[in-house]
């Protein structure tokens, strides 16, 4: 998945915002909280996608070649996809959507309603 495809997909999710920070990283948020990042963090010389995941997904994904605990964020169960061969674009989109849902669920009910994540 290219950075442009990553950004386009993240933009399509409900109530997302984007900021470019930390040396040019594309940081996507819901309710002001980060759920995914496309960056050059780590040893690979290309954009890598990092995202929040469930405990189970974290364990499974970290066993795959080309997926590592995300630099600076691993303790919060984030992974970084460093290889285009490990996961399909659809797989990555599914994990990004799950990351969005995980972070959105941590917002207050009022925030969720205000952002259109829950019925009014």
Give residue ranges: language-model regions:
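Charge-dense, helix-prone N-terminal extensions
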Residues: 1-120
